[in-house]
Amino acid sequence: DPYTGTASVARLSGNFQDRDVTTEEAINKSNVAQFVLARESYDSGLIGQRNWRTTLSMAGPAVAPAYIALHSESNPERPFRLYGGSRAVRVRILSIVLIGGAGGKRPTGATVRFQRSVYDKGRGASQALDSKIATMEFTYSPDLRLNEEDRLLNPLGFRVTNYRVDDDFASAPLPEREFPTPP
């Protein structure tokens, strides 16, 4: 338990290696992961090459403006201002849970737990930044108009229609506690 420090041993049983994954589940999770990785990571060398295009080719009209505003020159919290060219934000996805796929229906959303770290390119070292939970709704628009380059990034017309990120307090490292020094 991360809060009390109590340790326990749990034994998993079952055959987890042969778990069947449907093609639809694999494609949905891959698209969700690609969007979150592109949207939440930052590297000055990749933002214009891949992250920007991937995010905007998958972001719907209600989602794209927030990403554009995040990287706007007028935003004092924009990643380039915070990290510059010498540091990058790396994303590690911990889990993806598809939502709304019960009863043979297609999933319409996902919850993604991920951790971010800041990578110092000069030193080659990473430092934990935070843990987050992204909640999204999505659909597929096969008739979505994309140029050939964007269609290669998003061949099935995956479209994120709603997107929200919150702090994941369950997996966040505990803050340091100060104890009074004995006299």
Explain the meaning of each model-derived region:
Residues 1-26, 30, 40, 46-183:
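Structured, amphipathic secondary-structure segments that form assembly/contact surfaces
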